Amino acid sequence: MSVLWMVLGLAIGIAVGAAAGYIVCRSRTDRRLAETRADARSIIEDANRQAETLRREAELAAKEAAMRIKDEAEAEVRARRAEISRIEERLDNRDTALDRREVELDERRRRLSETEDELRRREESLAEREQEQLRALEEISGLSRAEAEERLFSRVEAELERRIGRMVRNRISEAEENADLEARRILATTMERLASDLTSESTVKAVELPSDDMKGRVIGREGRNIRAFEAATGVDVIIDDTPETVVLSCFDPVRREVARIAMERLVKDGRIHPGRIEQVVAKVRKEVEKEMKAAGRQALYDAKVSGSMHGDLLRLLGALKYRSSYGQNVLAHSVEVANIAGMMAQELGANVKIARRAALLHDVGKAIDHEAEGTHALIGGRFAKKCGESDEVVRAISAHHHEVEMQTVEDVIVATADAVSAARPGARRETTEVYLERLRNLEDIALSHRGVDKAYAIQAGREIRVMVQPSEVDDRIAAKLAYDISRKIEDELEYPGQIKVTVIRESRVSEVAR
């Protein structure tokens, strides 16, 4: 029974506790719900206030933007109106200027019309005067106008025919020169690059003696020393009345050089007799042989010729050192020709090696032309072939004086280089004299005319400048003077190409300021 009451009491306690807990929780829940609702109302009110604030700010910003856009639009309108006003002003000014220019043009047309009328009247007056003058001239000359014109035209026609013929000849000459223009350019380039030191070797060998008493010792008893010397050297010894001098004569330049050196050593030594003469001559001959080969090797170096060369050919090349032609040393001439030929071959794209070698050896025949028959070109070609030179080199040597037909460009180059070296003013005595004489004649022709003060031949005789006296020669006479000088040069001188005549008339006036 007691257990039942305990269970019942426990159940009642649990029920009462549960009811009390529910009541407590419900009261707390209601309180929290009320607080939450209050917070929600507060948040909503804050949100409404912020929304109102944002709306007002947006309305204010929109009003400000609208005002700014309106101001900008009004400013742009004002600027466009100002620009339109300026354009209208410029157009008005342009219209005014056009109106003013139209007035000026009308005035000019009027003046031009008046001037045209005046010129027409003057032209008619001049035509009438011309007719009067023609009638007067016809009465004075006894010729009609047609007859006078016919005579004048005949004279003019003859003069024009002569001048046209001369112009045709000049044009033909110019055409030929233009055809050779490239060759001339190559030659000019070659000569500009060439600088040669040439020394003319004298062909006369004279040995000075310390005194005339030495002549007797040179002659020897009954002339035995002279006979021994001539037999050993092959040179003629000439002893004449020239004081303190012995002359050696021989067509062979090498033998003449050997004799000169031997004679100088014998005279210096003082011991002159046949045995001593033979000994000295033999020694000198060996020295000269060595010197010839050394000169040949030096020539190979100076001419930039590569490859070996036969000893005999090298010796003959060195022998050209003692040979001269028109005052031009043959060995120096050969080296110069080799350098010219090398540069020309390089310009033309030819074989530089063959051109230089053949040019250096082109005159080697002159060293033995007294020993063999034929010209030096053919002799040199045969000797070069004998010494093992190539066919191209042999043919170029043989053909450089056109005695053998030229077949290659190297043949032409060697012949041209030889002509350039020989024809260069100053290279040979004979050429120099002819060249200077032509310049003197050219200046004399100019000085022979009245009013000429000075005359100078320049550009190697291709131009003459004539200074005239301004008080005697005016501009009109100066033109006629140039024509007269050119005609006289054509009639009296022979020259290649053309000669330009320049007449210079200069007036100078000076005053002193005090």
Curated annotation (Swiss-Prot):
PROSITE patterns: HD (PS51831), KH_TYPE_1 (PS50084). Pfam families: HD, KH_1, RNase_Y_N. Residues 330-423 form the HD domain. Its main location: membrane. Keywords: Cell membrane, Endonuclease, Hydrolase, Membrane, Nuclease, RNA-binding, Transmembrane, Transmembrane helix. SMART domains: HDc, KH. The chain crosses the membrane at residues 3-23. InterPro entries: HD/PDEase_dom, HD_domain, HDIG_dom, KH_dom, KH_dom_type_1, KH_dom_type_1_sf, Ribonuclease_Y, RNase_Y_N. It is an enzyme of class 3 (hydrolase). It is a single-pass membrane protein. Residues 203-266 form the KH domain. One of its GO terms (biological process) is mRNA catabolic process. Endoribonuclease that initiates mRNA decay. Belongs to the RNase Y family. HAMAP family: RNase_Y. This is Ribonuclease Y. It comes from Rubrobacter xylanophilus (strain DSM 9941 / JCM 11954 / NBRC 16129 / PRD-1). The lineage of its organism: Bacteria, Bacillati, Actinomycetota, Rubrobacteria, Rubrobacterales. The gene is rny.
